[in-house]
Amino acid sequence: MYDSSQEQRICLGSSEKIKSDNLRLQHQLFNLYDLINIIDSYSQEYVLTPFFNDNIDKIDWRFLSLNMNAIDILTKNRDKIDWDNLCANPCAIELLRENPDKINWIIVNGNLNGIDLLKENPSKIDWVYLSDNTNPNSIDILKENHSKIHWGILSQNPSAIDILKNNIDKINWRALSLNPSALDFLKENPDRIDWRFIQMNPNPDAISMLLEHPEHKIDWFYVSKNPGAINLLVNNPDKVNWDTLTVNKNSSHLLDLYPDKIDWSYLSEQENAIDLIMKYPSKIDWKTVWRNSNIFKLRSFNEFL
């Protein structure tokens, strides 16, 4: 069963208080609880891995502003931030709160973690974008405002399956066919399935369901970019659409077998492909790679000593 929680990302805090904490370590007596908290805050700072730190002069701030592990660097370089892109960054909420005049509210409505900002500024809610937001708190707001829901958008929201089951007459079945949390519901209503759209559904069970109905022709353009279809793609390399495979977040081991087929602009931003990216450093796209969260690592406490 597809678990939508796997898309929820943990955002670690900024390290702006490092200097003051160092003073506490050097000049103050503190209890064990203080020490544990300080060590924990240090262990949560992200820094560039050595290779990318050596190429820091190539930073593209527009793409870096989208990188959820780049908050520490962005906080120290606020004049270089692309604020529209930052509004889409799920780990940038505190930085946005500190700069309300820079907020693009339409983009924040689609930000997984933007719900607290919207609760503080309810007049800024855009109901179309909020209908696409998978945060459970967004779903709670939508439940309380049925008349404002965009049902076409909500139909593909994996966190909204309970609302949809209670409002079957409002479902957009084409959009629902994309919903990774709707497979059981779709199986109960096979005549409503859009068999072209279900080929883009990232739930692996969607591909199994497709294969159980050979009367519906596989569209390899759509299937090739589906992360839930990777086993099917591995077994049918002659049918893969290589242009769309590169955007598939689970495709790196297959692409590794066919490096001449890679679109490096797309691959460079793929988190799961960092090992493949580092295998061909001369191929890196030095714009899109700065969006890749795995160009960062957690700094160890020893690096502060």
PLM region spans:
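Extended intrinsically disordered, low-complexity segments enriched in serine/proline/acidic residues
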Residues: 1-7
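Alpha-helical scaffold segments
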Residues: 7-305
